[in-house]
Amino acid sequence: MAVASVMIVAGCADPGLTGAGQTPLAGPRAGTVTTPISPTTAPRGTPSRSATTTSPAPGASDPGTLTLAFGGDVHFEDYLRPLARDPHGLDQLRSTLGAADLSMVNLETAITQRGTKIGKEFHFRAPASALDTLASAGVDAVAMANNHGVDYGPVGLRDTLAAKRASPIPIVGIGADQDEAFASATLTAKGVRVAVLSASQVYEMTLLNWSADANSPGIASSAPTTRLIAAVKQARRTHDVVVVYLHYGLDYQQCPDGQSVSTATALEAAGADIVVGGHSHRVNGAGWLGNAYVDYGLGNFVWWRSHEPDSRTGVLTLSVDVKRATAARPTPGPIVRKAVWTPMLIGADGIPEVASGADATRLLGVWRQAGRCTGLTTSP
């Protein structure tokens, strides 16, 4: 089936003009995972014109290009619960999210079947088997620094941390203390060492009451950004690529707020190559910021709302130049050379499906429009 997507590349005309048809990314997965490292300094653009093209993005078989795919918010509540107990419940995502060399989502739930709800409107939880479902779908790591990771209080948090220790894929952004919460996980593919980190700056009761500190468990809080910046700088010293998956932005807004912009700017200066995230439940814009590629909001992904605009989503696939990523990089410049947005709609079953025809054209327009309020450039 044809996949409609926008591809942003360096060197041609404006990407805001036309949509494009593209075949799905494909190829064997080549990633391996190593254990997280603890955090404790190395900063490292200039825009040109760009184009929307119809040529396929480099897939997992291209040795000179590392592809990283990102999806938005995932939970397993309500009618999504059976998916968490079916190890193949999300396997249809392998042709999109799972087709890249490495992929990542935001796991917006406590991993527990116990505990007491904390005082808020919505509460999400899932059994540890949900991690097997995600792994089978081709997900290589999940971010859990968000406002639902501790929805079931201290008991739920203990279960979540136990699930993290036994997880088939790395979980970042939550831990038994601040060191663990801010620790990066290392993913390796095509000889490229990729650090992934996660933090939240959403001001609500999870961040206020359940931010990890020196002696207490919880999520990694980037309010203030001091500890996150230190973690990025440490990861920069020991990795070829540094990815930060943030929980940021304002509910139901399609443009980034000032705090999100300032945080992304600070992370780029600290050495992050890729900054992505969500929280707004809306697809936001994306583009290049100096040496980094930034996405201000990936939207919902596996979710219990199947009506627009909540159901608008997609997969962001970034192509990293392997030679440049693994070189010393004495001169500045981004290692992400190409970005592809594949628009999708969440179906009645809560699972996103690739948009086609008029829907694809319309959703590509929504994504391009969202990019116009970001201040980001459309090419490296």
Q: What are the residue ranges of the model-derived segments?
A:
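N-terminal export and membrane-targeting signals
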Residues: 1-4
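C-terminal motif of bacterial Sec signal peptides marking the signal peptidase cleavage site
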Residues: 9-11
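Acidic, metal/ion-coordinating pockets
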Residues: 13-31, 35-39, 44, 49-380
